[in-house]
């Protein structure tokens, strides 16, 4: 993945697949939309990236435009942990580090209603349990859509 150079990213993904590594191409915020459409034609799954640190509203517009262009398609989200965005779009998979960084770096705990608790060493069990509940909620929310996509992987 070469953030800021969509052509190099596509070339790297193609080469990995050529060598038998089932790489998933990543479409970054700010890349030409035509590349996303091409990825969707050529690969069974694609990823959306380049969103870490961006405002949620900007992420939402980007994700909405991506889904409008490629749905139904398996889509992975890099750097998306927002419950609102995960409930709004049928991601096949997603990952983010905010489950850990929110509490430890900024004192923001989803498990406690986004309450700010700082200081000392933190036990992240409550936060992990909150995200596991969110995962179950999303599985129920998007059950029909995932069935349409053919399940796993």
Task: Enumerate the language-model features and the residues they cover.
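Short, polar loop motifs at secondary-structure junctions
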Residues: 29-32, 80-84
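Long, polar low-complexity repeats
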Residues: 45-47, 58, 62-68
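Hydrophobic faces of well-ordered beta-strands that scaffold small-molecule active sites
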Residues: 23-27, 46-48, 73-78, 92-96
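Active-site beta->alpha loop and helix N-cap motifs at the rims of alpha/beta catalytic domains
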Residues: 1-33, 38, 45-52
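Short loop/helix-cap segments at secondary-structure boundaries that form the rim of catalytic
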Residues: 34-42, 85-90
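Alpha/beta catalytic cores of nucleotide-metabolism and tRNA/nucleoside-modifying enzymes
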Residues: 1-18, 64-75, 82-153
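His/Asp/Glu-enriched short active-site or ligand-binding loop at hydrolase and phosphoryl-transfer sites
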Residues: 44-55, 95-103
